Amino acid sequence: MRTISVILGGALAAAFTAAVLAQEPRLVSEDMMVPSDPGIEVFVRNKRPADMTTFRPERIVLFVHGSTYPAHTGFDLKLGGMSWMDYIASRGYDVYLLDIRGFGKSTRPKEMAEKPEANPPIVRGDAALKDIAAVADMIRKRRNIPRLALIGHSWGTALMATYATQHPDLVERVVLYAPVWVRETPSPIRAGAGPLGAYRTATVEQTRTRRFNGIPEDKKADIFPPGWFEAWADATWATDPVGAKMNPPVIRAPNGSMQDSIDYWSAGKPYFDPAKITAPVLLVHGEWDRDTPRYMSQALFPLLVNSPGKRYVELAEGTHAMYMEKNRLKLFEAVQAFLDESGRS
């Protein structure tokens, strides 16, 4: 199933995006479901300029989300009139995002219809990588290209990096935003001891508290422009109609990523070998990020020994969720500069 719409840039309330959207081309948006494993369909969204007729590897990007929230409510949520997906597409890119199975608009595994304690953690990295591979294959065939660029956020950085080690000839560039690496500190979203269930739940207020973790007290009041967090939360929690019926409403997230973290990152074992990545890599991190602390990026960067033109950018006054904060444009600009280099090389 595919849904196509046309998006027109408009006037913005936020000053920093007004000038950007004034120059935006008309964008086409297309939603589709891509088959993965038997019985699993992955939600994919594509945005591109309406007049785009030539598709080149250096101008095609695929984004994947982290361990709790889907891609389409973060990467393509209009805040101040513009989403990150819009920002990239309006610069002449063919941009895709996917919700991994169990998240957002993709198929929910049958275990999510049962109580979490009834099953072990679902949607581990190997399953998520099948979804990514299915979507990447579809894009390459659709556009008749040999490679594409990858953007991963949080857990998605481990997935995209792993994909790049497994398929080096299919990857143009890799952006790892809030990179995951071997832990020296406890995970902020791993609560309690004992075995994990199939999935976990989070309320809006629990998430709001986590979002402020690491921000200096005198900076908390204005980290989110008015209404931005609420807009994201409304869009995100609406993707889980089952969780919405609970009191208080929750979003359910598969625990496979948490089990992988226990078995690998928290056990001192890397999930992937950075030396096997042969594409250019950008690590980008917000200084107030406590979910994936700075030491992770600093440890990972020197291990990317075969990545030509690798770089690491630390952004001031940003957290793990900088894409929805007041300084989001700094994140967009840093990533865009890296993506644009491919077309000049």
Where are these regions (language model features)?
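Alpha/beta-hydrolase
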Residues: 185-284
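N-terminal cap/lid segment of alpha/beta-hydrolase-fold proteins
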Residues: 23-56
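Conserved hydrolase catalytic core segment
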Residues: 146-151, 155-184
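Conserved alpha/beta-hydrolase "acid-adjacent" motif
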Residues: 290-296
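Short, surface-exposed "cap/lid" segments of acyl-processing enzymes
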Residues: 51-97
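Conserved acidic catalytic loop of the alpha/beta-hydrolase fold
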Residues: 127-147
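Glycine-rich "HGGG/HGxG" loop immediately N-terminal to the catalytic nucleophile
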Residues: 71-73, 98-120, 320
